[in-house]
Amino acid sequence: MLLKNKKALVTGSSRGIGKAIVEAFLKNGAEVWGLCSKPSAAKDDLEKLASENGVAFHEIYADVGNAEQVTEVVKAALAEAGTFDVLVNNAGITRDGLSFRMKKEDWDDVLRINLTSVFLISQIVSGNMIRAKDKSCSIINMASIVGLHGQGGQVNYAASKGGIIAYSKALAKEVGSRGVLVNAIAPGFIETDMTAVLKDDMKAQWVESLPLKRAGKPEDIANAALFLASDLSTYITGQVIGVDGGMGA
């Protein structure tokens, strides 16, 4: 078990990539706090999986876009856990549209939920991590291939994910000497609820453009997160790990 005796906080844990990360962590011996906006359909299954692996799963609730609310909930979870060895900032939304038509509220919502929440949650958790003794801790931030290369119709999303990449690199330089690793994962075209709404012909075009000729699965991202959360990656920090089927090649 790669994460035996570790405690992890995962945001956006109720579905898709977040749920897959929680599952991978539980299977590898971590006790996990999953943060989502409301009680999820996955809760019972995740609690069962945790029990089968001799660990615990705790589902907690907050709107990550509400600074006061998410701060209160994360601080309470941290008090319960004592410390988090791993933080995965995965929660995110899209509000797509051409830039010249985009409403300011759509820009603000995406930046607040996708980027500002990463700062707020990491600030709380990293402050505790740097006081940990004789062990390394890991912060894993979910970026996107769009944050590296841009995408028309997603200027707000691209800005938020590009911001996550820059933030991760800067924070890695701040906390590395205290044993805290900070990395970002940049998924490509992954089969999730977020991509399921795309038209079939658009999805086919995306897949055809990939060297691997297939869409990724949430488990592909979860495997990368598992590696970064484990002691297999203790000399990796400030990096962006592309999990994109070759999209960024």
Give, region by region, the residue ranges found by the protein language model.
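C-terminal substrate-recognition "lid" of short-chain dehydrogenase/reductases
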Residues: 2, 214-243, 248
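Conserved glycine-rich cofactor-binding loop
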Residues: 14-16
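Conserved glycine-rich Rossmann-like NAD(P)H-binding loop of the short-chain dehydrogenase/reductase
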Residues: 28-44
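Substrate-binding pocket helix/loop in short-chain dehydrogenase/reductase
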Residues: 98-99, 103-111, 206
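Active-site helix of classical SDR
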Residues: 122, 160, 168
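Alpha-helical segment proximal to the catalytic Tyr-Lys
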Residues: 127, 173-177, 234
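Residue(s) in the substrate-gating loop at a strand-loop-helix junction
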Residues: 144
